[in-house]
């Protein structure tokens, strides 16, 4: 440890977090220290990292290769009982637990971490100093500390001197809960939050994304209550300062499409929109690597080097990586500090107001067009619907594309009612004069997925404005206006009906999908605003 690292660790007393007899604290260690720690030859099982030929370390997360939403819990108390969007009020994973159950779970984690040599990473969630969360993550596993160092915003030495956490994450991945059945819980594993104590605890799952997404869920609670949009989206900015945000569930293309050599990346997954504009929550990227190639995604491929951390990829004996192998999971990932992408907004990941808002969907039915411009009413409708296909591997038990509706393109991370996010977003869009588009990165009548080249051509046309200067035609049932041609895009795919040998096939699939949209949206029709939006969705005669 350097003198500064000794100084940082010496100042830290973890007894305030319920931990006792801690043998050593490594606080915000350097990447070199983490590299030595996570590749130690004496490490076993999921603690052990292996070296790859690209210079990055690779780890396995065991059976937990994605988030475990069925094991997510939030304490129901005076703070949350009337504000939180609970699982008995809609389609979400915010299952309530009592303070007593919380105390039992927390005791399991503090017992697991006490008496150990611990890593502590202090960082920020949110690039705006006025609204950011100061987050402290405590773990006994070196690579989990590495993941957090990659993903959260790294404080300066001066900021560390006065660092006081707003939220504490205690990751006791080795701890499991033997009493889960008596407590009415799903399994021995748990990811639990207490908004009064401002603490997250993790037990049983080794998946790194639980720490990142846990803090996203907390930002999703705190920011909209202040009138700030909290969004599951990527964002980038052009040479003229024009900002675009890309909403979408995991695997729909947020990271890939926002990582564009012609534009500077603000961030790839989680953002806020306040009076100054768009700002990133994170200090890193968490990109899918399944079937990654240097030719198709050079920026992401080149980011996989020393200090990047690979998850669940297949590493051959010679250290080479088989990115095409999805035998462990389709949800293979890499985390890296955002500066591994050359073309980023510096020094702070923030920019002005967005003028293009893009909803990415992966339509497993082959019904929706590759692109359509949305009216303000359609924007609200499709934001609340959040239609996509769950893609293989981002959650346990999902291996084939499955159609789903996820409010705000991120229902798994929402902690307030979806209409609150829609209201704040639309207010921000109206104030900025932003336009919205829906872009389908999924399948069509050919049975194949729309090519990344065609999708990039569509995004280019949206961002440079050329999509606004072409002829359009109306797609029935969904009442969407689609272009008849776009530069650099295969014209034959723009009307999805043209991709079927028999157009009647599209008609029957469109009716099926429309009925699903209508059934899902019924949950929002218990007030006048929701009823008024029904006209903006699909219509069946």
Curated annotation (Swiss-Prot):
CDD domains: PEPCK_ATP
Any GO CC annotation of this UniProt entry: cytosol
Pathway: Carbohydrate biosynthesis; gluconeogenesis
Cofactors (names): Mn(2+)
Pfam assignment, any one: PEPCK_ATP
Positions bound to substrate: 67, 207, 213, 333
InterPro entries: PEP_carboxykinase_ATP (IPR001272), PEP_carboxykinase_C (IPR013035), PEP_carboxykinase_N (IPR008210), PEPCK_ATP_CS (IPR015994)
Catalytic reaction(s) noted: oxaloacetate + ATP = phosphoenolpyruvate + ADP + CO2
Gene Ontology MF terms in the entry: ATP binding; metal ion binding; phosphoenolpyruvate carboxykinase (ATP) activity
Cofactor binding, per record: Binds 1 Mn(2+) ion per subunit.
Binding site for Mn(2+): 213, 232, 269
Binding site for ATP: 213, 232, 248-256, 297, 333, 449-450, 455
Keywords: ATP-binding, Cytoplasm, Decarboxylase, Gluconeogenesis, Lyase, Manganese, Metal-binding, Nucleotide-binding
Superkingdom, taxonomy of origin: Bacteria
Biological process annotations from GO: gluconeogenesis
Entry's localization field: Cytoplasm
Record EC number: 4.1.1.49
Record function comment: Involved in the gluconeogenesis. Catalyzes the conversion of oxaloacetate (OAA) to phosphoenolpyruvate (PEP) through direct phosphoryl transfer between the nucleoside triphosphate and OAA.
Assembly mode: Monomer.
HAMAP family, per database record: PEPCK_ATP (MF_00453)
Similarity annotation: Belongs to the phosphoenolpyruvate carboxykinase (ATP) family.
Name by which UniProt lists this protein: Phosphoenolpyruvate carboxykinase (ATP)
Source species: Aliivibrio salmonicida (strain LFI1238)
């Amino acid at each position: 440890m350097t003198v500064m690292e000794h100084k940082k660790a010496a100042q830290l007393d973890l007894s305030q977090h319920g931990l006792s007899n801690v043998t050593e604290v490594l606080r915000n260690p350097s990447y070199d220290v983490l590299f030595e720690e996570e590749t130690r030859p004496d490490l076993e099982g999921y603690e052990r990292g292996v070296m790859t030929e690209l210079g990055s370390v690779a780890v396995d997360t065991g059976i937990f290769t994605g988030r475990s939403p069925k094991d997510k819990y939030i304490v129901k108390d005076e703070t949350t009982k009337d504000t939180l969007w609970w699982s008995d009020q809609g389609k979400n994973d915010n299952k309530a637990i009592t303070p007593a159950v919380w105390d039992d779970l927390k005791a399991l984690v503090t017992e697991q971490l006490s008496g150990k040599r611990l890593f502590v990473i202090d960082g920020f969630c949110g690039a705006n100093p006025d609204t950011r969360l100061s987050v402290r993550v405590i773990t006994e596993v070196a690579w989990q500390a590495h993941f957090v160092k990659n993903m959260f915003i790294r404080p300066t030495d001066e900021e560390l001197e006065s660092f006081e956490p707003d939220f504490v994450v205690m990751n006791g991945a080795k701890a499991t809960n033997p009493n889960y059945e008596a407590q009415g819980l799903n399994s021995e594993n748990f990811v639990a939050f207490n908004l009064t104590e401002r603490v997250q605890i993790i037990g049983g799952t080794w998946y790194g994304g639980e720490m990142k997404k846990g803090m996203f869920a907390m930002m999703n609670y705190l920011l909209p209550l202040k009138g700030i949009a909290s969004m599951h989206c990527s964002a980038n900015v052009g040479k003229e300062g024009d900002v675009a945000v890309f909403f979408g569930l995991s695997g729909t293309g947020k990271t890939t499409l926002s990582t564009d050599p012609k534009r500077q990346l603000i961030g790839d997954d989680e953002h806020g929109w306040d009076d100054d504009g768009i700002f990133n929550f994170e200090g890193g990227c968490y990109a899918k690597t399944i079937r990654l190639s240097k030719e198709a995604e050079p920026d992401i491929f080149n980011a996989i080097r020393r200090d990047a951390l690979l998850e669940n990829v297949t590493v051959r004996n010679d250290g080479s990586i088989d990115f095409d192998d999805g035998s462990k999971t389709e949800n293979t990932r890499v985390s890296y500090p955002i500066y591994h992408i050359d073309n980023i907004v510096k020094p702070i990941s923030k920019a002005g107001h967005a003028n293009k808002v893009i909803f990415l969907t992966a339509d497993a039915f082959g019904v929706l067009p590759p692109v359509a411009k949305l009216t303000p009413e359609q924007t609200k409708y499709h934001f609340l619907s959040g239609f996509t296909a769950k893609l293989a591997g981002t959650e346990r038990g999902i291996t084939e594309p499955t159609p789903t509706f996820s409010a705000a393109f991120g229902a798994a991370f929402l902690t307030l009612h979806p209409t609150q996010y829609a209201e704040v977003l639309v207010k921000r869009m109206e104030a900025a004069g932003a336009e919205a588009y829906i872009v389908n990165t999924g399948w069509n009548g050919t049975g194949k997925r729309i090519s990344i080249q065609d999708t990039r051509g569509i995004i280019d046309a949206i961002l440079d404005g050329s999509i606004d200067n072409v002829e359009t035609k109306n797609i029935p049932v969904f009442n969407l206006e689609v272009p008849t041609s776009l530069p650099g895009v295969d014209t034959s795919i723009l009307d999805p009906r043209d991709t079927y040998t028999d157009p009647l096939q599209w008609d029957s699939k469109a009716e099926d999908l429309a009925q699903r949209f209508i059934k899902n949206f019924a949950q929002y029709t218990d007030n006048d605003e929701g009823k008024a939006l029904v006209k903006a969705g699909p219509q069946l005669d």
